[in-house]
C-alpha cells in the first residue's frame, strides 16, 4: 500500500480546507497519515479520508509527503485565489471532491431543527458587534425559529451575553451535532467552515478578512460583506471597523435570507 503524509498545522478552517486533498489521495489508494491538530483531523479519520492522525512528525518513510507550512507549500497563496483551488493546482489534482462531509448526525443533537448562532472566531478582529446577532436572533425568533448559541473553547466571553447557549468543545462531537441543525449564522471562523462543509445553509460575516481566499467548502454558503474598497486588511485592522456596520450587515443578511426557501 502506498503511504502518504500530509502535514498542516493551523485552525479548524485551515485544516478543513485540506480535507479534499485527503479525499482525492484516498481515492488513489493511499494509506494516509496526517500531522497537525489531532482534534481536527479526527473528523477526516471518521469519514475515512485519513487512517492515522498524529500530532508530531513520525520518523518513517512515505511514498509522498505533502508539507503545508514554511518549509513546504506556502499555506497562503500569493494571489487572491481560493486556498483550496491553490492547493489542488499546486499538487496537480483534479477539482473533484465532495461538497459535503459524509458524516452521520448525532440523533440526540441539542441543535436538531434549530438555528445555530456563533458570534465568535479565532480573533476578536474578525467579530462584528454582538448586537448584529441579537438583531438576527430577534428577527428569527419573531418568525418562529428556535435559536441557540454555540459556545466553543474560544468563546467563553459569550456566556456573559447570552442565556440560550450550548457548550461543546470537541470538534468531531460538534460536527455530528451541527449536522442536524436547520442553518448556521457565524463569522469567518472554523465552525462556520465546518457548518458549510456539513451541508447546512451557512451565513458568514466577513469584515477585515478575504471571502475569496477563505471561502468554506459547501453548496449553501452565503458570504456577507459590505465590500469596502479598504477590505481585506487583516491582520492590520483599523479602529473604526466600518466594514462591520451592524445596520448594513443586517440588511444584507435579510436579503440573502429572504432569497432562500427555508
Residue ranges: model-predicted function:
Residues 1-262:
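Catalytic machinery of carbohydrate-active enzymes
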